[in-house]
Amino acid sequence: MKMPKTIGLVHFIGIGGIGMSGIAEVLHNLGHRVQGSDQADSANVQRLREKGISISIGHKAENLGDAEVVVVSTAIKKDNPELIAAREKFLPVVRRAEMLAELMRFRNAIAIGGTHGKTTTTSMVAALLDAGGLDPTVINGGIINAYGTNARMGAGEWMVVEADESDGTFLKLPADIAVVTNIDPEHLDHYGSFDAVRAAFRQFVENVPFYGFGVLCLDHPEVQSMVGKIEDRKVVTYGENPQADVRFHNIRMDGATSIFDIEIRRRRTGQVIEIKDLRLPMPGRHNVSNATAAVAVAQRLGIKPEDIARGLATFGGVKRRFTLTGEWNGARIFDDYGHHPVEIRAVLRAAREACQGRIVAVHQPHRYSRLSSLFEDFTSCFNDADTILLAPVYAAGEEAIEGVSSEALVDRIKAAGHRDARHVPGQEALAPVIAKIAQPGDFVVLLGAGSITYWAAALPKQLAEISGNRA
């Protein structure tokens, strides 16, 4: 049974969240009555309001109104007044992933999973399906620049969704195609052990129906190990590994554009298809790998090589994924969501490949628990940066942990041999430091999942004001 149109008014608690807003938008576009609330106004809230969705700022029991269904994310705590009121009224309370799963039942679905790279890969798969004329519905974990939103209602039979593994609910998603980009020890507070994370991703792939398939990255040792354990389901592998079914090679750079070739091998027939000189307007081997995952999906869905090439060449990227926010004195300033050592290392390596000058990395660690559990990994992930500026930890509601701080990380990075690592006490201190060290041709890359995105947006203007005052 598919979700009927008669479910009544749907209320989203925390509707401005990146995952919740996309689901709310698609539900609204399908003709359902949708409303919601959020703690603060935001771009997502404004976008939904412009579509006619009523949104209250602040959480109060009366916000429910005539709601007959309530949708919550894992960020909503049990003492939320709206959640308490919903249960007192005996209303059905639906987890975000459950509602996403209901939407997926209306389409053939592609779910993109992995510890890193999900948002970009979801966007790339959507771009290639668009280029192939399949007009997909998309629900993503980031703003797709081509759409100006994280969700889009298509007329075609396919849906592309980002599968969030953080709380295990991605196992509820009824995907026909499951993509796994990588598996790293994240979200151990939920899973308890890395073995449990591994088991969840294996289940994610084995959940696809017999007529579906998994798309797995053979370059990542954890994913490669999982390939041989997948039972009774088709698997397509991709990566730079010569054994991959869909293999990228011959990477070159043209400024910030990656150029590469792809070789597609069909195991049963031995047929080999080559697509040469693909152009992707993003630097970095990790982005080429993500693009190859998208190609692996697209070619299985019958999209022609010339459409694949066009879709990649015109790919507009994702907000907060190496996003240029401005220039100052010939130095370029970028904003990136990277907050895990694996992500930071990949972003800075990509910056190194594209940059003619020096790399200045500005990082705001996100959560004390993450910095504590991955402290040693953080000491080496900035190696491609010439200068490292570390801001105070963005707590995200956590209590501080003794001995875990940006200052301690600076000391450890220096002890490990880095020549220029510094602590920056806050946003107001950043622009004066950058003004002294940034030179023409340099990249200034701000990284983190917290408020540092606002620093990145404001920095070009702050630098211009400093240079104007000097004049």
Swiss-Prot record:
Q: Where in the cell is it found?
A: Cytoplasm
Any one Gene Ontology BP term:
cell wall organization
Q: Which UniProt keywords apply?
A: ATP-binding, Cell cycle, Cell division, Cell shape, Cell wall biogenesis/degradation, Cytoplasm, Ligase, Nucleotide-binding, Peptidoglycan synthesis
Q: Which GO terms describe its cellular component?
A: cytoplasm
- Which range is the signal sequence, renumbered to this chain? none
**Keyword Nucleotide-binding recorded:** yes
Q: What is its main location?
A: cytoplasm
Summarize where ATP binds, as residue positions.
Answer: G114, T115, H116, G117, K118, T119, T120
| UniProt pathway | Cell wall biogenesis; peptidoglycan biosynthesis
**Catalyzed reaction equations:** UDP-N-acetyl-alpha-D-muramate + L-alanine + ATP = UDP-N-acetyl-alpha-D-muramoyl-L-alanine + ADP + phosphate + H(+)
PANTHER family to which the protein is assigned, alphabetical: UDP-N-ACETYLMURAMATE--L-ALANINE LIGASE, UDP-N-ACETYLMURAMATE--L-ALANINE LIGASE-RELATED
State the family it belongs to.
Belongs to the MurCDEF family.
Q: What does this protein do?
A: Cell wall formation.
In its UniProt entry, what is this protein called? UDP-N-acetylmuramate--L-alanine ligase
Record organism: Rhizobium meliloti (strain 1021) (Ensifer meliloti)
